[in-house]
């Protein structure tokens, strides 16, 4: 079945200024780790075909069918605020673009070996980082947040040196685009303005085709990216997601979450939470993500400056905050069960965040329990499950806030049971805590089995519904294991 996939390798047609043809370096003795059935459905292929010997060989670099056109894409980027003039795909290859019933998707092989852009790297990916990206794509899709996906993970017998010796692996990423803000920066800063325009025209054709050959199409591209980025980061903030490395080379031109490295979902609420322990100064802390999104868009606008009208570009960038705020407020009111705006809502929500921070409440658990809170039994329905029996005394102010909140919620002209049900569709039971991801990784490394990975992936795929025999993923880890910061090592 994989032999009959329809590829349209349009990026390859742009030429050698944009990417370099490279064949993947095969994994030694490849073995399948996992396959995501939802991504198979997205692509219109069977899970069995991916799991077959032929599929494992294709997605481990051991077999390159004629439909593939493996490319290492060139790009640059601002990393932690400093410009890096040439980055590019140092260990990943765009295998091709697959036409499906739901649109065109890139297939990208992470861990494909050295490329001209590897610099001092070995081009491999480790199993740990591939498992983390696999789970992240499933989790974000389950939450309804634009994201890349992972089709499968394959491990090999190759040993890779990071902080320790780890097994090599490949991950087949599926995304609507791998064009990054840094793709445009590369051509701008090298003064290759002809290629810059070619890339911009290509992006217009692929993602906003209604503007092809029209005046102002490049301003339309900037506005489109601004809008999609604002909505994406609003969604991150609403679920407590921290990306960790919001460099411009990790920002998708179409506003999908891309390049899952040292990410983390916030556990105990802390607006200044840092998930990447290499982020010494907190540039990419949770509360900085909205402003960094705008910073990155300004960098993109600078890269597009030879092609765009400055006043229109300024207007697009100035629209960012309003778009983000509107999207964030929409998501938060759904989490709170508010169907309409009322006077006093802003103060009520502000007090809520103060309580969350002061009591270090678990962000995901708080909102899920809030849907179940009952005015006539606040202690047992909300306070005790949230704080635990030993900490109820600390919840006096929280109980007062919850009573005020429930009074406000009752102003909605629908039955409370309906509101509770709706809140449960917007507040997940399960979130991808780094502690859980590490359990899956430990089992894979120590035992060579993947039962925790499979079970965790299943609950993350449908996070708003209770899963039998998965209660271990419903509650936060011990406090000393919460909010684990991880590194960029992968």
UniProtKB/Swiss-Prot annotation:
Coiled-coil stretches noted in the UniProt entry, renumbered to this chain: none
Residues annotated as binding ATP: 88, 90-91, 110, 122-123, 173, 180, 259
Positions of the catalytic residues: 249
Residues the entry annotates as binding Mg(2+): 250, 259
Cofactor(s), names only, from the UniProt record: Mg(2+); Mn(2+)
Keyword Zinc: no
Record's catalysed reaction(s): L-seryl-[protein] + ATP = 3-O-(5'-adenylyl)-L-seryl-[protein] + diphosphate; L-threonyl-[protein] + ATP = 3-O-(5'-adenylyl)-L-threonyl-[protein] + diphosphate; L-tyrosyl-[protein] + ATP = O-(5'-adenylyl)-L-tyrosyl-[protein] + diphosphate; L-histidyl-[protein] + UTP = N(tele)-(5'-uridylyl)-L-histidyl-[protein] + diphosphate
Top enzyme class: transferase
MF GO annotations: AMPylase activity; ATP binding; magnesium ion binding
InterPro entries, A to Z: SelO
Keyword Ligase in annotation: no
E.C. numbers: 2.7.7.-, 2.7.7.108
Keywords, sorted A to Z: ATP-binding, Magnesium, Manganese, Metal-binding, Nucleotide-binding, Nucleotidyltransferase, Transferase
Primary role: Nucleotidyltransferase involved in the post-translational modification of proteins. It can catalyze the addition of adenosine monophosphate (AMP) or uridine monophosphate (UMP) to a protein, resulting in modifications known as AMPylation and UMPylation.
HAMAP family in the cross-refs: YdiU_SelO
Family: Belongs to the SELO family.
Protein's name according to its UniProt entry: Protein nucleotidyltransferase YdiU
Underlying gene: ydiU
């Amino acid at each position: 079945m994989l032999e009959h996939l329809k590829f349209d390798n349009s990026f390859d047609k742009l030429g050698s200024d944009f990417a370099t043809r490279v064949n993947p370096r095969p994994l030694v003795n490849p073995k399948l780790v996992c396959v995501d059935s939802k991504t198979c459905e997205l692509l219109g292929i069977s899970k069995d075909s991916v799991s077959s010997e032929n599929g494992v060989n294709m997605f481990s670099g051991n077999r390159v069918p004629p439909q593939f056109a493996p490319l290492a894409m060139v790009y640059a980027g601002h990393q932690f605020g400093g410009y890096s003039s040439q980055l590019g795909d140092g260990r990943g290859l765009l295998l091709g673009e697959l036409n499906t019933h739901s649109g065109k998707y890139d297939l990208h092989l992470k861990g494909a070996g050295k490329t001209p852009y590897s610099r001092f790297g070995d081009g491999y990916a480790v199993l740990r980082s591939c498992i983390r990206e696999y789970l992240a794509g499933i989790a974000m899709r389950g939450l309804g947040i634009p994201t890349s996906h992972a089709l499968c993970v394959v491990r090999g017998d190759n040993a890779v040196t990071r902080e320790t010796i780890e097994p090599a692996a490949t991950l087949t990423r599926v995304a609507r685009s791998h064009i990054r803000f840094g793709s445009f920066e590369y051509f701008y800063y090298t003064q290759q303005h002809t290629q810059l325009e070619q890339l911009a025209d290509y992006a217009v054709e692929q993602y906003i085709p209604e503007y092809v050959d029209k005046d102002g199409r490049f301003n339309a591209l900037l506005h489109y990216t601004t809008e999609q980025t604002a909505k994406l980061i609003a969604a991150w903030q609403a679920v407590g997601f921290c990306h960790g490395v919001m460099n411009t080379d990790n920002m998708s031109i179409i506003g999908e979450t891309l390049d899952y490295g040292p990410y983390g979902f916030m556990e105990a609420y802390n607006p200044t939470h840092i998930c990447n322990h290499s982020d010494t100064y907190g540039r990419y802390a949770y509360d900085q993500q909205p402003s960094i999104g705008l910073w990155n868009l300004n960098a993109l606008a600078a890269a597009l400056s030879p092609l765009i009208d400055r006043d229109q570009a300024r207007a697009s960038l100035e629209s960012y905050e309003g778009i983000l705020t509107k999207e964030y407020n929409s998501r938060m009111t759904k989490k709170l069960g508010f169907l309409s705006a009322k006077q006093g809502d802003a103060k009520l929500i502000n007090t809520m965040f103060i309580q969350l921070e002061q009591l270090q409440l678990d962000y995901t658990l708080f909102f899920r329990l809030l849907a179940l809170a009952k005015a006539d039994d606040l202690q047992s329905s909300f306070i005790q499950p949230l704080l635990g029996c030993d900490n109820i005394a600390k919840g006096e102010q929280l109980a007062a806030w919850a009573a005020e909140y429930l009074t406000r919620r009752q102003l909605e002209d629908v039955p409370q049971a309906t509101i509770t049900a709706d809140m449960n569709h917007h507040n997940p039971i399960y979130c991808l805590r780094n502690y859980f991801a590490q359990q899956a990784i430990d089992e894979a490394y120590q035992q060579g089995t993947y039962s925790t990975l499979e079970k965790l992936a299943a609950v993350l795929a449908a996070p708003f519904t209770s899963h039998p025999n998965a209660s271990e993923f419903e509650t936060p880890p011990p406090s000393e294991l919460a909010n684990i910061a991880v590194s960029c090592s992968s």
